[in-house]
Amino acid sequence: MLAGAIEYLHRRQSLPAWTPSRLALYYDGRARDFAEARDAGATLVDVCNGACEHGYADEALWPYDVAAFAEPPTIAYRLAANRQRLANFEVLAHDLATIEFELAAGNPVAVGVEVYRAFEDAPEGRVPLPARGDLHVGGHALLLVGYDAARGTFLARNSWGAAWGREGYGVLPFEYVLDPALCGEIVTVRAVRALDVPRG
């Protein structure tokens, strides 16, 4: 979900609009744990640190192909990635007021959540709290982009495409994110740093 956050920050900072390579972000995140050869996931903090250290570039230079997850990005990609880096991110506590503050300030918030079968089958993207006996599927990252205090829900962008939820967006209860057993990581990204990229 860091790619979606970077896309948003580029628009907010009036930088050229393109999609960062998700495969390269994932590779650099796994490299933090010397796990490039394993498709075992990566923490949000590792992916953010990778984008701070190595930068990122257009997905056109390193397209998403899950079969190529263990291949290092090309030299051409690395040269392009040197031109912009993630500049600022912060790990947040499981605190509603803090998360609401970041979202109200226009800062996207990425969360790493535990996914259950009901999440995959959520009608119109309305994600329920898991019930006793629900099948655990694994971990997954979402990008929180808003909240509804009256309904007690976050608006989240998923990475599964427009077929999930409402055009790729869904809502989940505050409790889903605030429970450390259901949400392991909460990270906000506030800025990217362009070194010599012309402004759009």
Task: Identify the meaning behind each predicted range.
Residues 7-25:
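Phosphate-handling active-site elements
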Residues 1-8, 30-157, 162-200:
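Predominantly the structural core of cysteine protease catalytic domains
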